[in-house]
Amino acid sequence: MAYVEMTVAMMKQFGVEVQRPASDTFVIAEHAAYQAREYQIEPDVSAASYFYAMCPVVGVPAKVCHVHWESLQGDTSFLHVLEQMGCRTEEEPDGIRMYPPTEGFLGGVFDFSAFSDQALTL
């Protein structure tokens, strides 16, 4: 998810609706106000990806606490790349656990344009 989309999603989580009459236009009500609430700050999925990338290389499972598929961060897409390369994932209550490939690490062609920071990790 692009940073602008992440910002809009977080604004909504805190009670501010953003209208999008056009792809390049954002409208916020004049008297919109943020609402205080408890909020679990997501870990940096970009940094977490190094641990997930070690899983197939070292051959051991890896889990980073509080990384979940519904993350606002686009870097979770990197985990799907690792799945396509033979890894298996399970979402647990406290994070995504990745298991190494059982039949070798597969190659492939991948589009990293939505999560370009991870191209070097791979």
Regions found by a protein language model. Give the residues of each.
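Short, structured segments at the rim of ligand-binding sites
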Residues: 1-122
